Design a protein with these regions (language model features):
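Bacterial N-terminal signal peptides that target proteins for export
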Residues: 2-12
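C-terminal segment of classical bacterial N-terminal signal peptides
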Residues: 19-26
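Active-site-adjacent loops and short helices of periplasmic peptidoglycan-processing enzymes
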Residues: 29-206
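Conserved small/polar residues in nucleotide/adenosyl-binding loops
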Residues: 212-213
Length: 213
């Protein structure tokens, strides 16, 4: 519950920053939390983002940035890379949005782990690629991410290699993936990529995950 509350506050801070429409050059000395407080919002210090960036999607113009090159764990944003790789497989003709996968004991085990964001899964149930993508976005399902990743690449270690290769292709410097979910590998045992360390935690920067056309 606390994680969801923090996410909501961070989204709220982004909204405040967008409303301010302050040129990036004028806000470098200010923190996101300070901007919100100046406008009458009383927020605790723990809601100050470690780093942030807001860009105009079509032009790439930076509207706001704060510690945009600071490395930090992307958490569930990691799962977007799985969706991207799945779309590439669709484009290559290796997958379709209607392609299906069946829930097995591995996926139900992952779905039952309370330390992970998930959805309930019943053994034998089938999901299409499109349905798995929806579950990855909301409710950020770890089990759905595993299912989709396995459809793209059956070897978890090879899948992580592909994640890192794609990150390099996209120019995502200072980024390293250790798994497809966005938690430390010890929370995923025994399903973590065995070539990766148990304390491996994905790392990136706000700048690397900002999106523009």
């Amino acid at each position: 519950m606390r994680k969801r509350n923090v996410r909501g506050i961070c989204a709220f801070l982004c909204t405040i920053l967008l409303e301010c429409l302050i040129p990036a050059g004028e806000v470098q000395a200010q923190r996101a939390l300070d901007v919100a407080r100046e406008r009458g919002y009383q927020l605790e210090e723990r809601y100050q983002p470690a780093g942030s960036i807001i860009t105009e999607i079509n032009t790439g113009q930076i509207l706001w940035q704060e510690n945009a090159q600071k490395q930090w764990p992307p958490a569930s944003m990691t799962k977007l890379m799985t969706i991207l790789l799945a779309y590439e497989e669709i484009k290559a003709g290796n997958l379709e949005l209607e392609s299906t996968a069946e829930v097995n004991e591995r996926y139900t085990d992952i779905a039952g782990r309370y330390a992970l964001s998930n959805n309930k899964m019943q053994p034998g149930a089938s999901y299409t690629v499109a349905e798995l993508m929806d579950l990855i976005i909301v409710p950020s399902s770890a089990a759905a991410t595993y299912m989709l990743a396995d459809m793209v690449e059956s070897d978890p270690d090879r899948f992580v290699e592909r994640m890192n290769q794609k990150a390099q292709e996209l120019g995502m410097v200072n980024t390293k993936y250790f798994n497809c979910v966005g938690v430390t590998n010890n929370l995923l045992q025994p399903y973590h990529p065995v070539s990766q360390p148990l304390d491996g935690d994905n790392i990136t920067t706000p700048e690397a995950v900002s999106y523009t056309h």
